[in-house]
Curated annotation (Swiss-Prot):
HAMAP family tied to this protein: UPF0102
Highest taxon above the source species: Bacteria
Record-level Gene Ontology MF annotations: nucleic acid binding
PANTHER family from the UniProt entry: UPF0102 PROTEIN YRAN
The species this protein was found in: Clostridium botulinum (strain Hall / ATCC 3502 / NCTC 13319 / Type A)
Pfam families on file: UPF0102
SUPFAM superfamilies: Restriction endonuclease-like
Record-given protein name: UPF0102 protein CBO2440/CLC_2288
Record-stated family: Belongs to the UPF0102 family.
NCBIfam families: PRK12497.1-3, PRK12497.3-3, YraN family protein
Lineage: Bacteria, Bacillati, Bacillota, Clostridia, Eubacteriales
InterPro entries linked to this entry: Restrct_endonuc-II-like, tRNA_endonuc-like_dom_sf, UPF0102_YraN-like
């Protein structure tokens, strides 16, 4: 990913964090990294720990942003989530879910749209 795409991704993650906070989520981690991979946002939603992948695009021209999350990427997120659960010793305390947030930016102005897909995938 080149520099401009990193900026777009980071901007999308900031929008996503604001959005889910307004939905009542509590942010636990941003950009959790380990040797297995990275999870954009880890949050608490009631009795769930939610592992969230954020995809930011300027349009749907190449399909929806969530379509870019391949099975391989899902598996990587799942394994990273497993490590987080073990590290935090929370396996018996919460339910777990994988959400996706799509952020579509507008090139003409500062408007954007956000779509939260709860339980977007299961491994």
């Amino acid at each position: 990913m080149h520099y401009c795409n990193k900026d777009i991704g980071s901007f999308g993650e900031t929008i996503a964090v604001d959005y889910i906070k307004n939905c009542g989520y509590i942010i636990l981690e941003r950009n959790f990294r380990c040797k297995l991979g990275e999870i954009d946002i880890i949050a608490k939603d009631k009795n769930f720990i939610v592992f969230i992948e954020v995809k930011t695009r300027y349009s749907y021209i190449y399909g929806s942003p969530s379509e870019a999350i391949t099975f391989r990427k899902q598996n990587k997120i799942y394994k990273t989530a497993q490590l987080y659960i073990i590290k935090k010793a929370i396996h018996n305390k919460f339910y777990f879910r994988f959400d996706v947030i799509e952020v579509i930016l507008n090139t003409l102005n500062s408007n954007y749209s956000v779509k939260l897909i709860k339980n977007a995938f299961q491994i």
